[in-house]
Amino acid sequence: MIMKNISYCLLAGLIFGSCSGKVYEQTDNGVIVKVQQKGEQNARLVRFQVMGDKLIHVSATPDSKFADSKSLIIVPQEKQTPFTVSQQGDTITVSTKEVKAFVLSSTGEVWFTDENGKMILQENKGGGKTFTPIEVEGTKGYSIRQVFESPDDEAFYGLGQHQSEEFNYKGKNEELFQYNTKVSVPFIVSNKNYGVLLDSYSLCRFGNPNDYSQLGKVFKLYDKDGKEGALTGTYVPDEKSGAETLVRREDSLYFEHLKREDLSKVVNLPENFPFMGAKVTYEGMIEPSQTGEFKFILYYAGYTKVYIDNKLVVPERWRTAWNPNSYKFSVNLEAGKKVPIKVEWVPDGAVSYSGLRVLSPVDPKEQGKQSWWSEMTKQLDYY
């Protein structure tokens, strides 16, 4: 009987201990929090590491432990910064003398205030971190997205050098990759007196996490004769070339890459057509299935103009044929309403480039938030 009572006491103690156990572990430089909310795309662990009185390193992973590869952009800490850890309900707080970092153990939601409690930065309400498994050539990782709330009067500056004619990236989209005339840095400074640095080395996107779509994936296309399924492409050669005018249907305008096996030819453009001195027109109608602001990206070399709904939406732009560039613009369209579209292109070279793709409308409130996406990484890391 005595042995039974002892067994019951031990069992009760184990149950109570497991229920009352801490949801966080304090470390030498911060805290690790176990997120209680389950979900395949959710974080299981969130970590704060204090890097300075105003600098917090935030990590999150859907795995049972952190993948902690050596950062290629962060220098080692020379000294530790004093901090405290406290818990109130399911909120764990790490405090320095100038900033406080909070995380909800229930959802993993994160936010930051100054020492007086004034909000600095808040993760998307309900949780702004998602992880999607990805595997490339046997290497596993995650496509991650991190979203923060953003007031209407906020401005974002940074992201590197993109020749995009954009300065304030609030409500804008930018792809972050390295290119001949494009220098990408996943770092922004806010007019609200804080900055965010995403520690990721893969393709990233600020703003809309989706890739631009081919026109035919978003719109119904009609050629210049009204036949559905494509636009009309008309290729008029230089008179001196002796070639004939070529007319064909175009289900997309995507002439942005050289063929690997023949670097004198561009993917999807007609072969054996003399582009030097030629004039090209793509025209027809587009019909959206949604109403709203459609965001286009024009890839261009040579001389290019774009008309939509009989309006010149992109005045003539020029770029040397061997060094193309991108230009972003937006047009409001109405669901079910066909509008004319025309692209006039003078390649200005034997090998030249052209492309027009589009993003479907996004809720303006969502578009205005601070959104980061990384194609492939081991875990989420930002400062």
Which positions does each model-derived feature cover?
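Intrinsically disordered, low-complexity peptide-like regions
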Residues: 3-6, 197, 249, 260
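Extracellular/secretory pathway-exposed regions associated with glycan biology
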Residues: 212-295, 299-382
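N-terminal accessory segment at the very beginning of proteins
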Residues: 19-218, 278, 293, 308, ...
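Hydrophobic transmembrane signal anchors and adjacent membrane-proximal interface regions, especially
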Residues: 4, 10, 106, 219-221, ...
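Bacterial Sec-dependent N-terminal signal peptides
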Residues: 1-30
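Generic detector of ordered secondary-structure context
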Residues: 11, 40, 179-180, 228, ...
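Sequence-pattern detector for short linear motifs
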Residues: 7, 73, 148, 251-252, ...
